[in-house]
Amino acid sequence: MSRAAAKFKIPMPVTKADFAFPSLRAFSIVVAADQQHGIGDGETIPWTVPETLAFFKDQTTLLRNKKPPTEKKRNAVVMGRKTWEVPLKFRPLKGRLNVVLSCRRPVDDLLAQLPEEKRAAAAADVVINGGLKEALHLLARPPYCSSIETAYCIGGARVYTEAMQSPCVEKLKEVYLTRVHTAPTCNRFYEFVRRRRARAAVDLESTSGVKVSDAAAHLSYEIMKYVPHNAEERQYLELIDRIMKTGLVKEDRTGVGTISLFGAQMFSLRDNQLPLLTTKRVFWRGVCEELIWFLRGETNAHVLADKDIHIWDGNGSREFLDSRGLTENKEMDLGPVYGFQWRHFGADYKGFDANYDEGVDQIKTIVETLKTNDRRLLVTAWNPCALHKMAVRPCHLLGQFYVNTQTKELSCMLYQRCCDMGLGVPFNIASYALLTILIAKATGLRPGELVHTLGTAHVYSNHVEALKEQLQRVPVAFPVLVFKKEREFLEDYESTDMEVVDYVPYPPIKMEMAV
């Protein structure tokens, strides 16, 4: 039932260059310091702990899957000129893109320091840039936005200081701080501990505990990982915690049972941010394909199943449709659900294989009226006249769009009447974030915010233990979304046209869907 005819489609303008990529690349810091936060004396690091050197090499070289770098994917290490001047035999740091910060020296000067036999190979491993801000701007754009998996800031003191100042600190994802227990002899200091109090809250995600080196005169050390406090995802986790502690235990349609509260969450979409929750991996490809399926007006669950996305299989089964009295529907025909209401509101539903050119096209109307600064920008999936024909009644049922005429930003407020906090809500947050981003692209606006208002926010009883596990995890920074390919029409986008960059979630947590 795809809206293939061009007259029904929504044209997409070419994205302006400033909108296509985040302003700066997210980055991590790797640093070793003594108990007084000293990191060196301007020339050397006054200790040698083989275990911490091995950690530095592995952390900055290996990819997130713990495998070595490849021709298509590696990490970047961003450093000042003095940090670059490690012993000559180590230059450039192998298997990594070396980004050296210098306003005066061209890259040819750095390569000239190397033995002649190393220069040709090193040319592809070394780039030079001004300051950290300029380097992060470079790494946020092609080819580096796709070829670099993680950018690491590795010093020295001036570079660390810039990293903890705006605008760079807003892109900080992680700090790997190795604390070496040794007598203080440094005159260069890393300011993370002091600046974190003044600038942004951080969470200690993990620690190795204090260990004693086997080879460094029995020096002790501790490797700690800090992450900036993710207040937006904390809203989600704190609501789950409140539901499980104070919610009302109720029976529900599925027979599983719920614990519920009647409850708004807000997520920023600025600078390409995508609120894809990090305390468990969210099935991004499923989110993306389902939203595109909605935007095409589809109601045939086979379309998703054929792409190995089975989120609608249970509701489209013969058994479930018959239980809803939809005995005339073909298997996997969900009836006039979300996509049909978005694109054909009020039309008579005749099955997923019929062609439709009637009804109100709410999505196209929103795109067209946004250009006139209209305030009546609503899309609803709740059609009382058609509820009895739907396999499931809409949970996320109303979106309102709003334009900030000063910043040219588009925001969306989603009202969701029924909120499965374990499985559905993480999906819905990402889905309506993507919807807002796509409509912003279609109208030449910047994405602003997603405000998520929850009606009955509930936890299924069979999700409680899994969510307790999730609540023990520390949320990290959200990823960003970049578009690898432009399309002429909104409905023509595919999930492969988009790339999520710097998504480093915890592993998935299995939860059964209540049907």
From Swiss-Prot:
Which keywords does UniProt give here? Methyltransferase, Multifunctional enzyme, NADP, Nucleotide biosynthesis, One-carbon metabolism, Oxidoreductase, Transferase
GO cellular component terms attached to this protein's record: cytosol; mitochondrion
- Spell out the molecular function terms from Gene Ontology: dihydrofolate reductase activity; thymidylate synthase activity
Where is NADP(+) bound in this sequence? Answer: 32, 38-44, 81-83, 101-104, 155-162
Q: Where is this region: Thymidylate synthase?
A: 233-515
Binding-site list for substrate: 30, 154, 160, 178
Function, please? Bifunctional enzyme. Involved in de novo dTMP biosynthesis. Key enzyme in folate metabolism. Catalyzes an essential reaction for de novo glycine and purine synthesis, DNA precursor synthesis, and for the conversion of dUMP to dTMP.
According to UniProt, the name of this protein is Bifunctional dihydrofolate reductase-thymidylate synthase
Give the organism's phylogenetic lineage: Eukaryota, Discoba, Euglenozoa, Kinetoplastea, Metakinetoplastina
